[in-house]
């Protein structure tokens, strides 16, 4: 039999029996980046593919959740199981409740899975790697700046601005060139 028949593509349905296979391996779910957008997405898919590959090499059952059929992470031979699902909490929660993974990896898929961190944590699932608090401190620009200063990590001169007046004052203090970035955004559409 072709290897394609040994892989599972899974789609959610209601009111039907469960006919997927199970293993004795520890399960880890990787949440992908979803749709690619100009300037965002491909690098996160690359991270997810390598994460899934490492999980499989180390004896874990690698389960991928992603909504983009045009990515490498959704190829038939990448993960042990693949769920084509919107990367919204209700759909992700349904997969997690069904699979009962030992842990969930959200750090490889960019901003989309990071936005699910609190929900995943509050639902009692283990987030692999960074804790919810650490994730928050890296996404909040002010907290991250303070963390770097506390650890004596060199960083570019920066300021936090919460108004247009503070922004102009900060730019005048720092000088050009200047990079403006909001908290809790890596890039893409949310940069508006």
Residue ranges and their predicted role:
Residues 38-44, 52-61, 65-79, 101-139, ...:
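A short, GP-enriched loop/loop-strand-helix hinge that lies immediately N-terminal to
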Residues 75-85, 89:
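Structural recognition of alpha->loop->beta junctions
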Residues 88-98:
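A structured beta-alpha segment of the ubiquitous adenosine-cofactor-binding alpha/beta core
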Residues 19-28, 96-100, 171-174:
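Glycine-rich phosphate/diphosphate-binding loops that line cofactor/substrate pockets in enzymes
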Residues 7-10, 14-51, 56-61:
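C-terminal accessory/binding modules appended to enzymatic or scaffolding proteins
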Residues 1-5:
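Short, small-residue-biased leader/transition segments that mark boundaries at the very start
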């Amino acid at each position: 039999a072709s290897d394609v028949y040994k892989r599972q593509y899974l789609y959610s349905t209601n009111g039907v029996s469960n006919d997927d296979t199970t293993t004795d391996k520890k399960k880890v779910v990787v949440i992908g980046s979803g749709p690619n957008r100009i300037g965002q997405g491909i690098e996160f898919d690359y991270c997810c593919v390598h994460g899934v590959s490492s999980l499989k090499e180390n004896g874990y059952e690698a389960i991928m959740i992603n909504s983009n059929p045009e990515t490498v992470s959704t190829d038939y031979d990448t993960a042990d199981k693949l769920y084509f699902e919107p990367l919204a909490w209700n759909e992700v929660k349904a997969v997690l409740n069904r699979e009962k993974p030992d842990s969930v990896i959200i750090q490889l898929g960019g901003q989309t899975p990071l936005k699910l961190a609190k929900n995943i944590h509050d639902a009692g699932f283990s987030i692999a790697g960074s804790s919810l608090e650490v994730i928050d401190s890296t996404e909040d620009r002010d907290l991250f700046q303070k963390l770097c200063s506390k650890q004596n990590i060199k960083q570019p001169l920066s300021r936090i601005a919460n108004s247009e007046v503070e922004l102009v004052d900060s730019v005048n203090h720092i000088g050009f060139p200047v990079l403006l970035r909001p908290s809790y955004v890596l890039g893409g559409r949310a940069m508006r």
